[in-house]
């Protein structure tokens, strides 16, 4: 038996661009007012790449380090003299004849030391308080610019069955599929070229069954939209260049009389010069970033994990002649092996694949009374995961038949589930610099 299925559709593209604050409101932040123009630190809900942020004061701090280095070299390595000279240069921007405007201060700094002239906007801006409370984010991209919304799904199924005898049948089944879609989980993901296959071999008879199956995943060319956009911005223009460019332009425009918002918009235009626009997701540059694993400085997540399962059960009623006592005895067991393989992009498996073994066994004894009016069952199972202590879970139930197709069921049971593979081993970097960590790494 063979079956095929193909589906194609237009996926939804997220278009909520509300400004989002990660530091106010609820524990996870909240949507706030403001656009890119009104908030230099704008972080759009479905805008990708604008999660990179910095305060202008921190940009000044890094520049200050460079200035001190140049002065120290000029004073033959004398750090004390360099600090004193820096204090004089900085003080000239605070008050005095050279603090009138940026042009005057730049000329003063150039006269003091020509090598320091490029640093004038940063010292002047800090001295005049232009950086206080100003945080700035990189310019991001809309989801429609980076994600292909065409969803595809192709499936093939097939099976072969062989009758060994009147009571026993063997079968081999295969299921495989591939496709593209857009997925929202801990972040927004473009799932492209995803592959999933399962192969099952089973032999079953009247009173017993044994089967084994293997599931294989392949994430294809899937990528994290947020991380990819941030790295794309860094590749086009590193933040170590973008922020100093923005800061210098911002001070220039503020000194020229522009208000805070207009100066910020103008400075962004200067810093964004040469920035690709439009459908960047189709560009070779973006694809190169999306093709590099997250663990190596790109946006691609890899998942070639596998699951192997062997399970069996046996109805021992006939073997032990329990039918004459109106009783049934069923036993079974299962063995699982997880092989996690994401090369450090999803799980904490940078050093190599992570294996997890899990097994379990169960038994159930049932007995019927009063011409099947009452059925009492006792069952229990024991499960063990190599990362956790074993657990025994019992169950007792009674079913009373009060009329045809009418029953009363009374039961007591316990249940337990081991943490999932992600609960145990996830190590995923998501938007805003947040990292999801499992309980075991």
Predicted regions, residues:
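Periplasmic-side early beta-strands and strand-to-turn transitions of outer-membrane beta-barrels
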Residues: 1-192
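Transmembrane beta-barrel strands of outer-membrane/channel proteins
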Residues: 2-8, 172-178, 210-214, 331-337, ...
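Conserved C-terminal beta-signal and adjacent last beta-strands/turns
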Residues: 3-9, 151, 197-199, 204, ...
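Extracellular/periplasm-exposed beta-strand and loop segments of Gram-negative cell-envelope proteins
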Residues: 15-20, 133-150, 190, 223-229, ...
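Transmembrane beta-barrel architecture of outer membranes
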Residues: 153-159, 169, 188, 194-198, ...
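Face-selective signature of the C-terminal outer-membrane beta-barrel domain
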Residues: 200-388
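Surface-exposed extracellular loop regions of Gram-negative outer-membrane beta-barrel proteins
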Residues: 218-225, 386, 391, 405-441
């Amino acid at each position: 038996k063979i079956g095929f299925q193909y589906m194609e559709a237009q996926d939804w593209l997220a278009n909520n661009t509300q400004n989002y604050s990660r530091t106010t409101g609820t524990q996870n932040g909240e949507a706030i007012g403001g656009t890119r123009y009104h908030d230099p630190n704008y972080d759009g809900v479905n805008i990708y790449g604008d999660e990179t942020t910095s305060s202008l004061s921190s940009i000044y701090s890094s520049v200050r380090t460079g200035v001190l280095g140049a002065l120290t070299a000029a004073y033959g390595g004398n750090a004390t003299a360099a600090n004193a000279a820096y204090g004089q240069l900085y003080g000239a921007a605070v008050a005095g004849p050279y603090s009138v405007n940026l042009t005057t201060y730049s000329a003063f700094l150039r006269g003091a030391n020509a090598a320091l002239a490029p640093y004038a906007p940063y010292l002047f801006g800090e001295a005049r308080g232009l950086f206080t409370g100003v945080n700035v984010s990189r310019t991001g991209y809309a989801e429609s610019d980076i994600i292909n919304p065409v969803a595809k799904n192709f499936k093939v199924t097939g099976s072969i069955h062989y009758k060994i005898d009147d009571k026993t049948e063997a079968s081999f089944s295969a299921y495989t599929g591939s496709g593209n879609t857009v997925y929202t989980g801990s972040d927004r993901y473009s799932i492209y070229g995803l592959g999933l296959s399962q192969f099952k071999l089973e032999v079953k008879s009247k009173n017993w069954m044994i089967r084994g199956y293997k599931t294989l995943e392949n994430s294809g060319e899937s990528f994290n939209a947020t991380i990819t956009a941030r790295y794309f911005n860094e590749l086009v223009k590193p933040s170590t260049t973008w922020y100093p460019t923005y800061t210098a332009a911002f001070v220039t425009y503020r000194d020229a009389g522009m208000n805070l918002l207009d100066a910020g918009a103008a400075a962004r235009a200067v810093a964004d010069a040469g920035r690709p626009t439009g459908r960047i997701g189709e560009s070779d540059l973006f694809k190169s970033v999306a093709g590099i694993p997250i663990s190596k400085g790109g946006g691609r997540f890899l998942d070639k994990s596998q699951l192997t399962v062997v399970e069996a059960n046996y109805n021992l009623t006939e073997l032990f002649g329990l039918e004459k006592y109106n009783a049934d005895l069923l036993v079974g067991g299962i063995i699982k092996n997880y092989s996690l393989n994401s090369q450090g992009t999803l799980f904490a498996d940078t050093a190599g694949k992570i294996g997890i073994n899990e097994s379990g066994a169960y038994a159930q004894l049932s007995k019927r009374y009063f011409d099947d009016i009452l059925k009492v069952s006792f069952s229990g199972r024991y499960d063990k995961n190599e990362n956790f202590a074993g657990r025994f879970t019992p169950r007792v139930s009674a079913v009373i038949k009060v009329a045809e197709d009418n029953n009363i069921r009374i039961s007591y049971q316990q249940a337990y589930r081991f943490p999932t593979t992600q609960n145990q081993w996830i190590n995923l970097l998501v938007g805003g610099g947040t990292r999801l960590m499992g309980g075991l790494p």
